[in-house]
Amino acid sequence: MKYIYLLILFVIGCSSTDNLENNFGIVIHGGAGTILKENMTLELEEKYKNALKEAVVIGYEILNDGGTSQKAVEKTINYLEDSPLFNAGKGAVLNFDGEVELDASFMEGKNLNAGAISGSKKIKNPISTAIKVMNSSSHVMLSGKGADDFAVEHNMETVEQNYFKTERRINSLEKIKNIENNKVSNLSNSDYRVQKLGTVGCVALDKFGNLSAGTSTGGMTNKKWNRIGDAPIIGAGTYANNKSCAVSSTGWGEYFIRGVVAYDIAALMEYKNLSIRKAAKTVIEKISKMGGDGGVI
């Protein structure tokens, strides 16, 4: 595959007494796509690796100190949202109108509680607001102005659009518009497809045996009509159940929605007793046959 996958950093910890009840683990991804391997300089690649390492350390330390998987997932993703390198929060891709629209979702496996937001134009850390929706409302998913209003009412940090925008994303929008307008003839299909991918995510297991999963994204470059991908959709982009697994997806959202990717993996584990590796492989192969691509943790 031509794309570079900013996957995966995995850490698992055990107590010195090897008590399985004290095991914990965390896995993160920085998205599939958004940058082609041949366009990645060594310097930029090192920046990505360092940012991912720093992010996973945040979650690891929380879990190691006995913190919850919810907190570990939230704070790890917060770090990635605050970095201009990733397609989430600051540095997210731009839509057709040159604006950022942000999506995020969170789910905890112990009780199947979940929260999500989509189409936000000013929430600094969408994953935190998704968790706030879960904990402080009777709803699961809020969108657009409603999500932004909810964030303000609950004292979540909001910022102006210029905070999110970077020169790299502005240039990417111009490039993809040229492709779609047939003004540039020397760009490959992969140049076009790579603009459709990109997300950050984290799954974690805490010492209490509880799983959590979270996903945050700016979606696809040049998206129109308030398009929403899989990232904020529970069961497609994010899923967690203590009976099976925790999943965060990254890839071509339309296919991941149609394939109900995150839940499908958990269902294969719970109802067909497949291993997590076999279940994930089966579902990703299904998506590939449909014409999509991407990955999961």
Spans of model-derived segments:
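Alpha/propeptide regions of enzymes that mature by internal proteolysis
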Residues: 18-297
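Sec-dependent signal peptide recognition
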Residues: 1-7
